[in-house]
Each structure stands twice: as structure tokens, then as C-alpha cells.
């Protein structure tokens, strides 16, 4: 999925286009529809180079890079191309795919892309299946159809050449290659700098289609106008990676909260899911907007909320997802969403570890259901998790205190305190952990104090108990794991 652009050499402009037609094919009259592989004057000399920008699923990136970067170095040496990938967590907006920019001759672009396509087709079996695990365990479930797709990002000008007058060129590309070629939607309002081309088919069909698309890149003088591999700081709208739906990918201001949710809730692909049922009984006005906004935010970034094990009751989920207000605060919306799920779980009844009513708003009961009963009645955390819930001195905020076993505090903190910071950013609550050696009297438990709005404190409490529950489950399955 890359976009290729010409680099002029010594001011020469004579082109050497690729001709996919057999040598004995007859030339068509000028008035006939354009061939997908037609040979218009190109913008570079015989030694000219171009750029191709493509999307690479996260599961394939490692095999393309290789151990210590050996594979990608060897690929560059063999093809003469230069290959750049966005950083491991720097995804194209609205996806969990990395951006790859290839620079080289037409032959090199085709060779490198052929290698990348092969690695994408090698989807590991454990990536394609979903297991009933804690929502805090990272997941990489991918749409199985992705292995048959190529996603190329091209400048808007190149997209016009690929489509052709009245769609004649893209039709010819499909006819000659046998692949299905679609472009992301063209917006009525703000023009996009780039469009995403999705090619679907068998390996050989996709290979031919990509060669024809690279020809169009070769013909466009502006095809090298968008050479960024990171979209983290791009202002304004960005093209949707999918050919259907909105022309635009997720906006930059939504991504930070959704990205934080990625690490906290675990990833599961939701491609093609248009909406969640979310007419919640007992919620109206701003509350409903916040909750539905959170659903939209997380779903649009690819997170399957159904895997939380906290599905809303049928009575509470009887309609289509309300349109999220553009002004809604994503962090507050996510907090409200988590709080709502926990409340629904509380109302659903008891769990293996005890009754839901034992714990404030059912959040620990929810955690039990979501983690296959790892959080049983014998758990020290289950026995004394909630130390107290009260209002702050000024009465404006809730204060929740939780007891956490000393040997599990590290799971909440994360490396360098990263997990704790993410929890606070996602929920808007303030989370404090007692100093090392300061225990709840008579125990070896540290005290965790959560301060914030009711929704924020409950969301933070829920995330903390989920993390602890997951860590306990991992240790139960692997007794050798410590700390």
C-alpha cells in the first residue's frame, strides 16, 4: 500500500513505461477507452525512481523487518530500493496498520511489494482466532479477508489517473488483472490530499493490478507529493482506509483516547461494523451522548466491545447507536461507557466469586465474568478489594479506596509507571498508590486511592480490577511467573 512518485534525474523526462500487454497485441485506435497499461509520457528518465506508499498489518511487519532488521536490509540490497516503515505504534488513522514507503525504480517497487504481499498472506494462525481471555490481554484479531487485499495510499492527483474519465481506467485495470479495485470515497466538502486504493483478489491478480497502478503513479508528476509515513501530526482530514463508508478516517483528536484504549482493552477487528445498539434505559440527554460517543470512538478504532464480557442487556440495547456529538469529550465518554458496562453487569446477577452486589456498582463482578472466573471468592483481592467509597471534602468528587496485594502493584504501575498514567488519561480520574512498605493495617496490601467524578472513579476502578484479574489468571496458569 504505497504511493509512488517520480524523482527527476538530470532534468530528463523520457519515460520507459511498463507494458503488460503481450508483444503481439494490436494497438487500439485513439478513440477507444484508455488501456490500464497505456504508455503516456512519464516524468523521469530511464534511471528514475518513484515512491510507493502502502499499509502493512501489524502481524506482518515483524517478518518484513526480520530479526535485527536483517530481512529488510537484505531486501533493500537485492532490489536497490529504500524502504521506510512507521514506528511500531504509529498506525495509519483508523487502523492498526503501519505505513511503508518504498523508493526505487519501477522494477524495484514491484519486487518489494511482491515480497510484502507474500508476508501479508502468511497470517499466523494465532492472529486469526479469538480466545475468551481478559479484555486487558492484548489481542491481534485481524479480518481474514485482509490477506487477499493490497492497500495503496496515493495522492489525490494519482487517484484521478487511476480512475480515469468516467471510471474507464479503473475498469480496464480490473478487466486486465482480474482483481477488484476500489478507492476510498471522494468527499463533497474538504478535498483530501490522498486516497486509499484497495485491491482485492488472488495473488497473481493483485500483482498485475499493482503493476498497472504503479504505471499511473509513474505518469503523475505529483505522485511524490505525500511522502510522510507518520500521520500523528497531520492536521485536517485523512482518507478512510476502507473503500466504503465515510471518506474520512478518524480525526486526530479522537485517536489519543482510542489509542490509549488499545493498550487497555485489547484489540479485535471490527471492520465493516457500522454501529452498536446503544439506546440505554435510564440514560438520556448528555449521558447518552457521552456513552454513545465512547462506543463510536472505540468501535471506529477497531475495538470489539462485545469481547468485554459485559454486553448490555436486551432491554437496554434495543435501538441503533445514536449519533455522537462532535463536541463530546472522548475521555469522559469512555469513562461513562465503562461505568455503564459495570452497572449493567451489576444488575445481571451473581458470579462465581459471589454476588455482584458485594462490590460497588458490580465492577468486580464484571471483572469476574470477563476473565473466566479467575477472580474467585478465595482471592485476597476479592475478600477485601473495596476499602471505602466517600465524597471528597468539598463534596464535588468521589473517593474510592482499593486494597491491592503488594505483589500485584507492578501490574497496575506498568513499566516506568506507563500503565498507571494511561489509566488516568483514559478515565480522567486521579490514581494514587501508597508508598512501598505502607500497607493496609493487618495486611500485605497497598492502598490505591481513586479520586474523580462518579463515572471516572468507577471506570478507573474497573480497569484496575481487570488488570489485577488478568495478572492473577496469568500467574495461576504459569506458577513460575513472579512479580
UniProtKB/Swiss-Prot annotation:
Q: Which GO terms describe its biological process?
A: mRNA processing; nervous system development; regulation of alternative mRNA splicing, via spliceosome; RNA splicing
Picking any one GO molecular function of the record gives: RNA binding
Renumbered ranges of motif Bipartite nuclear localization signal? 27-43
Q: Which GO terms describe its cellular component?
A: nucleus
- Annotated region (Disordered) at 1-44
Cross-referenced PROSITE patterns: KH_TYPE_1
> Would the keyword RNA-binding be found if you checked this record's keyword annotation?
yes
Where is this gene product found? Answer: Nucleus
The UniProt keywords, alphabetically, are: mRNA processing, mRNA splicing, Neurogenesis, Nucleus, Repeat, RNA-binding
| Alphabetized InterPro entries for the sequence | KH-I_NOVA_rpt1, KH-I_NOVA_rpt2, KH-I_NOVA_rpt3, KH_dom, KH_dom_type_1, KH_dom_type_1_sf
* Transmembrane residue ranges: none
Q: Which Pfam families match?
A: KH_1
- The KH domain sits at 49-116, 147-213, 397-464
Tell me the segments the record calls region Required for RNA binding: 395-479
Query: Carries keyword RNA-binding?
Result: yes
Q: Write out the domain note.
A: The KH domain consists of approximately 70 amino acids and includes a conserved hydrophobic core, an invariant Gly-X-X-Gly motif, and an additional variable segment. The third KH domain (KH3) binds a hairpin RNA loop containing the 5'-UCAY-3' motif on targeted molecules. RNA binding by KH3 requires residues C-terminal to the KH domain.
PANTHER family reported in the protein's UniProt record: KH DOMAIN CONTAINING RNA BINDING PROTEIN
Query: What biological function has been recorded for the protein in this entry?
Result: Functions to regulate alternative splicing in neurons by binding pre-mRNA in a sequence-specific manner to activate exon inclusion or exclusion. It binds specifically to the sequences 5'-YCAY-3' and regulates splicing in only a subset of regulated exons. Binding to an exonic 5'-YCAY-3' cluster changes the protein complexes assembled on pre-mRNA, blocking U1 snRNP binding and exon inclusion, whereas binding to an intronic 5'-YCAY-3' cluster enhances spliceosome assembly and exon inclusion.
Quaternary structure and partners: Interacts with PTBP2; the interaction is direct.
Write the protein's name: RNA-binding protein Nova-1
Q: Taxonomic lineage of this organism?
A: Eukaryota, Metazoa, Chordata, Craniata, Vertebrata
